[in-house]
Amino acid sequence: MAYLKKSLFLVLFLGLVSLSICEEEKREEENEEEQEDDDQSEEKRGFLDVITHVGKAVGKAALNAVTEMVNQAEQ
């Protein structure tokens, strides 16, 4: 009976250890995925910021050009 108890405790202990290791690996994978998602969203945000700044610059240049044309037409 004692031999059976020891075997049972050993099996339970090894099962808990392997479960713990699997959960730790799963957490690490989730953290890596979250980090990759964060990196991708930062890249998208940076790209959108560049597009926004370029759009503003183009809009200002076009507005200045139209204003100059109107001023020249009035003279």
UniProtKB/Swiss-Prot annotation:
GO cellular component: extracellular region
UniProtKB keywords: Amphibian defense peptide, Antimicrobial, Cleavage on pair of basic residues, Secreted, Signal
UniProt-annotated location(s): Secreted
Tissue expression: Expressed by the skin glands.
Keyword Ribosomal protein: no
Acidic residues compositional bias, start-end: 30-41
GO process annotations (BP): defense response
Signal peptide residues on this chain, from the entry's feature table: 1-22
Family as reported in the entry's similarity comment: Belongs to the frog skin active peptide (FSAP) family. Cruzioseptin subfamily.
Annotated function: Has antimicrobial activity.
Protein name as catalogued: Cruzioseptin-6
Species of the source: Cruziohyla calcarifer
